[in-house]
Amino acid sequence: MSEEKIIGKGTWIDKLASELLEREKKLGRSLDVINVESGLGASGIPHIGSLGDAVRAYGVKLALENLGYKSELIAYSDDLDGLRKIPEGMEKFGLEEHIGKPVSLIPDPYGTHDSYGMHMSSILLDGLDKVGIKYEFRRAKDTYNQGLLKNQIHTILENSTKIGDKISELVGQEKYQKYLPYFQFVKNAIDFTQQKQQNTLQIRKLSNTIVMIQK
């Protein structure tokens, strides 16, 4: 009976790192530096699950390094996400007028950072610093303003039907079969929300917000 080969330190993270390496080799990508990313939700107050996502990503980075590869953890703030709802305990700040706006364009209600989104991200970054996780911080706002993803966005839009079908196949989400995987930033918009219990239609004017585009 042959012994099963132990990868790295024998953990599931080591196995994941090994599978990642095999995938990158098959795709012919450079292995000079392998970036691992953890998204930082910037629309709400971070919690233990938010920290857990970053810790697991950091574990993959360490496993890759243990296998002899250089790796970096990117802590990526999704600060172009729209504010979906008011976080519990923050009702007093009058954030209702900012619902739907990218959180990077909402003023920080505490006045300590350049935006609401940066304030929320900073809370999680402080946690990463305290537990000794090394990372490179990036923001969606800067990434898009600098046009760093324009080629990737073009490719995604060209293949939106294929991508929508694959998302539906893998996770059962059918939204992107009807809508483009793209959120348009608009200066002015109107939101129609049907109130089923009252059988009424609520109409709100929105400014500097993001909307989905139907195919």
Q: What does each model-found stretch correspond to?
A:
Residues 1-48, 59-75, 90, 95-100, ...:
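Non-catalytic terminal extensions that flank enzyme cores
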Residues 4-7, 42-51, 103-115, 145:
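The substrate-binding groove and active-site-proximal loops of carbohydrate-active enzymes
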Residues 45-49, 83-88, 148-149:
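A short acidic (Asp/Glu
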Residues 70-71, 108-111, 122, 129-140, ...:
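Short secondary-structure capping/junction motifs at helix and strand boundaries
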Residues 75-78, 136-148:
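Acidic carboxylate-rich catalytic motifs and surrounding loops in phosphoryl-/glycosyl-chemistry enzymes
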Residues 80-97, 152-154:
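Charged, often glycine-rich, active-site loop that binds/positions anionic groups
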Residues 94-131:
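A glycine-rich helix N-cap at a beta->alpha junction
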Residues 146-157:
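Feature captures the FAD/FMN-dependent oxidoreductase FAD-binding
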